[in-house]
Regions:
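Low-acidity, Ser/Thr- and Arg-rich intrinsically disordered low-complexity segments
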Residues: 172-173, 177-188
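Alpha-helical scaffold domains
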Residues: 1-166, 189
């Protein structure tokens, strides 16, 4: 059984995999997550969430009932690692129209263009915001516009916009040189 004490250490990839294998054998992935993901010690929460990243797609689907608690965790935590890992799990879960939360959409929109945010968090927020808006084409276009505008202020936004447009099928392009500042006239929408 995995204990709080065991999750307090600094872990390597192999140790995260060992945690996952032990949780898999116990057959209680959702219970493990529910127990440790909101732990007051960020190291414990981080290691628990990291171990669960090793789950297969089918196993990960078991976490669907934790979608909204994971969303709350992502929005409320002060720890960047816990935020990134909770966003990673959210991104792997199904998002239906009934799951759309405007507070979470606002969170994603704010963090995807925040120059002080880590690039991994920015890219996950971009992808999740785009997926949340797929039910509303006008909103989806607005997310793309925000990404384009965010590229003016943040090179990370531009890099991740270029990466994700191929992954999730953005229809718009940003013809920009990576070495010169972009002017508003150089953006095509």
């Amino acid at each position: 059984m995995i204990t709080e004490e065991r999750l307090k250490g600094a872990y390597s990839e192999g140790e995260a995999l060992a945690i996952y294998n032990e949780v898999k054998q116990s057959g209680d992935l959702i219970g493990f997550c529910r127990t440790f993901m909101n732990h007051e010690d960020y190291q414990v929460a981080r290691n628990a969430l990291w171990g669960v990243t090793k789950a297969s797609k089918a196993e990960h689907a078991q976490l669907q009932p934790l979608l909204h608690p994971l969303i709350d965790l992502a929005m409320q935590t002060d720890n960047a690692s816990v935020r990134r890992l909770s966003l990673y799990h959210i991104e792997r879960l199904k998002l239906e129209e009934d799951d759309l939360r405007t507070d979470f959409l606002d969170f994603c929109l704010a963090h995807m263009v925040n120059p002080d945010e880590f690039p991994g968090i920015q890219s996950l927020c971009m992808k999740i915001a785009y997926r949340m808006c797929k039910f509303y084409p006008v909103s989806q276009g607005q997310v793309i516009d925000i990404l384009i505008i965010g590229a003016f202020f943040n090179s990370y936004s531009l890099q991740y916009y270029s990466f994700w447009k191929g992954k999730i099928g953005f229809a718009r392009t940003v013809p920009v040189s990576w070495t010169t500042p972009m002017s508003i006239a150089s953006v095509t929408v």
